[in-house]
Design a protein with these regions (language model features):
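C-terminal outer-membrane/trafficking sorting elements
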Residues: 31, 391, 397, 426-513
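Propeptide-to-catalytic entry region of secreted or membrane-anchored zinc metalloproteases
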Residues: 36-148, 152-157, 323
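Active-site-proximal segment of zinc-dependent metalloprotease catalytic domains
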Residues: 137-214
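The catalytic-center signature of Zn2+-dependent metalloproteases
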Residues: 186-290
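Residue-level detector of functionally pivotal "anchor" positions at catalytic/ligand-binding pockets or at interdomain
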Residues: 317-335, 415-436
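Conserved aromatic anchor
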Residues: 345-353
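Beta-strand-rich modules
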Residues: 386-402
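Extracellular fibronectin type III
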Residues: 401-419
């Protein structure tokens, strides 16, 4: 692993004064890209308010772990880009991180749903921040109240993997405090950083809190879980020291470690520390982590499960009712034997029950070359997104804010022809005629404007492969006319050519379902 940045206690004291209870979370090594596996977390010790709250929960854990009601928490996701719109990550990549987050929180019976589509913020001072102040401003200006605000941005200028705020410690104000900020390089779909940061956001300290600086200190968490040790041995203090959880073994390792660990450390009783690498709130490598403890899960639930809880405002607004996604979308076009024009390709599918958004992926040689989200049941690929005379395949799936883990349809192959034409219009330079709408449904007439009255106008409609569909002529009486196309036109893309008095115009049309 590349060199790490080590934060001293004095550093955290300075940061506390500067940031007002901001606890940084996940400092990267010099090689970005793999969530926590290549970077240390820099979150400081949990604030006193968090520790007091966790201590108050100790007697309630048995009842909490028997609570089987699911808690649904609202999320607002933000993608930060430069002021020119450069950089960032895709909306579908954010969906993948939320899907992964939900899978990791299943044992806690907590799920996260998106309240709306991902928000894009184009601001270079937030995108390439080299200090915390712009990010504090970002949160103050953009947080959506009563939701968990997650920001995805470029933190490489600060060598950070991400950071989060404990309850009641961050910017944003009443029922709006704090956020989770993730770097792009740490937002891998299978990474554990986001689960780790949500743990902090929901009141979980690191497993080594208050122990790593001096494992033999009397206030450090001891290994024993016996509350009635015989002197001179000291009894267990796991509910009032360390991370305040007695079902997470005492931990002393405050740097990234591979599992199993070969480090040897004794506590004040002379007992050997045996930290558990499987906990998300430890510093073990990503491939070691897989769970929260029952008491950790109970504490996170308690943090949101009543109006008076530290983040109880997250459950004040009833969650929306999302439809259940049934099956996968049935594809209409292209099918296995179909050929499409690469610069004018229309992809169509039937609506899927419960979906209000669709994700379309196109592959070449099993490589995903195109990935987009559309709110309708078709996508019109224009320009050079596809290459001519090639073999491709495609899949589509339905999504909604409550289910970002749905299955894709089976993959079907298709071919592309050569490019048929380019550009939206091909007009005679002096002819200013207009055709609208260019997106139409059955029965919609097309309006022709700025044509010459009294001069015959000839029109021809061809399909996406250049085949003639129908022709006709008009005798306009003034500078405008209505053109009624056949009502039985299949859904798809077309080319309308107009000719009048040595002038010519070509317009792309799209017949909608």
């Amino acid at each position: 692993m590349t060199s790490m940045l080590t934060l001293s206690l004095s550093f955290f004291n300075r940061m506390h004064r500067v940031l007002g209870m901001l606890w940084i979370a996940c400092i990267l090594g010099l090689t970005p890209g793999f969530a926590q596996s290549n970077g240390e977390c820099g979150t400081g010790p949990a604030p006193a308010s968090t520790l007091r709250y966790l201590e108050s929960l100790a007697s309630t854990y048995d009842a909490q772990t028997e609570d089987t009601v699911w808690i649904r928490l609202p999320v607002t996701a933000h993608i930060i880009r430069s002021s020119s719109g450069f950089g960032g990550m895709s909306e579908s990549a954010v969906f993948a991180t939320i899907c992964n987050l939900n899978e990791r929180f299943v044992p806690a019976r907590i799920s996260f749903y998106l309240t709306e589509r991902v928000k894009f913020i184009d601001n270079t001072s937030f995108y390439g921040a080299t200090s915390y102040q712009p990010l504090m401003t970002m949160i103050d200006q953009n947080n959506v109240p009563r939701t968990i605000n997650i920001y995805y941005t470029d933190l490489s200028g600060m060598s950070l993997c991400g950071f989060a705020f404990y309850p009641l410690t961050g910017p944003g104000g009443f029922q709006n405090d704090g956020a989770v900020v993730m770097s792009f390089g740490c937002s891998q779909p299978q990474g554990t950083t986001l689960a780790h940061e949500l743990g902090h956001y929901l009141n979980l300290p690191h497993t080594f809190d208050e122990t790593s600086s001096n494992p033999v200190d009397p206030i450090a968490e001891r290994v024993t879980r016996n509350f009635n040790e015989v002197a001179p041995r000291l009894s267990a203090n796991c509910f009032t020291a360390g991370d305040r959880f007695c079902d997470t073994p005492s931990d002393f390792i405050a740097s990234r470690w591979a599992c199993p660990s070969s480090r040897v450390q004794l506590d004040l009783n002379g007992d050997l520390f045996r930290p558990d690498s499987s906990y998300y709130m430890s510093y073990s490598n990503d491939n070691c982590m897989s769970r929260f403890s029952p008491q950790q899960m109970a504490a996170m639930r308690a943090t949101v499960n009543s109006p008076s809880a530290p983040r109880g405002y997250l459950t004040l607004t009833p969650p929306p009712v999302f439809g259940t996604l049934v099956g996968t979308p049935t594809k209409i076009f292209p099918q296995i034997t179909d050929t499409v024009v690469p610069n004018n390709a229309l992809f169509r599918w039937h609506p899927q029950q419960g979906a209000n958004l669709y994700q379309l992926r196109i592959f070449q040689f099993n490589v995903n070359v195109f990935d987009t989200l559309v709110p309708d049941t078709f996508y019109h690929a224009l320009g050079n997104r596809l290459r001519g005379v090639r073999q491709y395949s495609w899949v589509v799936r339905g999504l909604n804010g409550g289910d970002l883990c749905s299955a894709f349809s089976p993959r079907d192959s298709f071919s592309t022809s050569t490019y048929v034409f380019a550009g939206i219009n091909e007009n005679t330079a002096s002819w200013q005629a207009k055709v609208y709408p260019t997106l139409f449904r059955e029965g919609d007439p097309l309006t022709l404007a700025h044509i010459q009255p009294g001069i015959p106008l000839v029109w021809k409609l061809t399909d996406h492969l250049g085949r003639q569909v129908c022709v006709g002529n008009l005798q306009p009486e003034d500078s405008g006319a209505l053109l009624h196309l056949p009502g039985d036109l299949p859904t798809g893309s077309y080319r309308l050519e107009l000719r009048q008095n040595q002038q010519r115009m070509t317009v792309k049309l799209l017949r909608l379902p």
